[in-house]
A protein has these predicted regions:
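N-terminal organellar transit peptides
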Residues: 1-128, 134, 150-152, 162-305
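Internal, hydrophobic cores of structured domains that mediate oligomerization or house catalytic pockets
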Residues: 132, 140-147, 151-153
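Catalytic nucleophile serine of serine hydrolases
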Residues: 137
């Protein structure tokens, strides 16, 4: 016969289990509801941009978002899933219609980036890539395929030199050349062979992409600079540097692009590390100069935009 104390303990355990499952259900429902709400806002913002530009707009934005079941941050990068989605959107867009891509990415899979870039090069309508903050590595490869690149004045592109695992292909080849083939392992020799092939492949592809916008000699020079590994992989190519390379770059970034970026907040659930009071411009009156007035609501974010 069970004692009252044991019965009471079992009752508490049952209540605790029920409370746990109830809390889990509430968390899931809140996440689903919040996700649908932000998706509607994003669709509305992209729709507004399409109306402003009379174009098809595709956003490929890789943020570290709380995308998992319990809000654990998941960092994004260019993947095969991304290339499939972008190619599908391009197929659904009339050939002559302008195509605008909002691009914010650290890079990702070379194959996926090359698929997207090839599809953009083959477009008949004008292709414009907007880079509000950065488009590195594979993101730069996609940007090179555009007829025009619109960058924020402080935005950056990056080198497209291939990486073998966590190591730059150019550095692998250089290391083997310094030590000599007889003084390195078979594994390193295999890596060096793969690295050299990757360098040739990427450089060749960049040339093919750039031939749409510049002479072959210039395209070869630009491809060499971007893919030979003269810089570290995170080297920032600024607006000025991109123009010196011969890329067609504008800094006339539409306000709507920043509005779209605001709908992709940096995830993680941590306290923002950057705080500021945004300025709000008062309506201009006749005979007076409008001055920005501070919004009394402080805003915070993980990166200034």
């Amino acid at each position: 016969m069970e004692t009252p104390v044991r019965l009471w303990s079992q009752h508490l355990a049952n209540l605790a289990r029920a409370a746990f499952w109830l809390l889990l259900a509430v968390v899931i429902l809140l996440q689903l509801g919040g996700s649908r709400g932000i998706d509607r806002q994003r669709a509305a913002a992209l729709g507004q941009f399409e109306r402003e530009r009379s174009s098809r707009v595709i956003a490929m934005i890789h943020r570290q978002e709380g995308a998992s079941l319990l809000g654990v941050p998941v960092a994004g990068s260019i993947s095969i899933d991304d290339s499939e989605a972008v190619l599908r959107a391009i197929r659904l867009t009339p050939a002559e219609q302008p195509l605008d891509i909002i691009l914010h990415t650290p890079g990702g899979l070379v194959l996926a980036a090359e698929q997207i870039a090839k599809a953009l090069v083959e477009r008949k309508g004008k292709v414009t890539v907007f880079v509000p903050h950065y488009a590195m590595s594979g993101g730069t490869l996609i940007a090179l395929a555009a007829d025009e690149i619109v960058m924020d004045a402080n935005a950056v592109l990056g080198p497209v030199d291939p990486q073998i695992g966590d190591m730059p292909a150019a550095s692998i080849v250089k290391a083997v050349a310094i030590k000599g083939p007889r003084n390195v392992s078979d594994e390193m020799l295999v890596l060096a062979d793969i690295a050299q092939k990757a360098r040739v492949q990427v450089a060749s592809f960049v040339v093919q992409v750039l031939l749409k916008h510049m002479p072959e000699k210039q395209a070869l020079q630009v491809a060499t600079v971007l893919s030979e590994g003269r810089w570290t992989h995170d080297f920032p190519i600024t607006v000025e540097a991109a123009r010196l390379l011969g890329l067609k770059v504008s800094t006339e970034m539409p306000r709507t692009v920043y509005d779209v970026m605001d709908l992709y907040p940096q995830g993680g659930g941590t306290k923002p590390s950057v705080w500021y009071v945004p300025l709000r411009r008062a309506p201009a009156q006749a005979g007076s100069t409008s001055q920005p007035s501070p919004d009394t609501r402080p805003e915070g974010g993980n990166a200034a935009r």
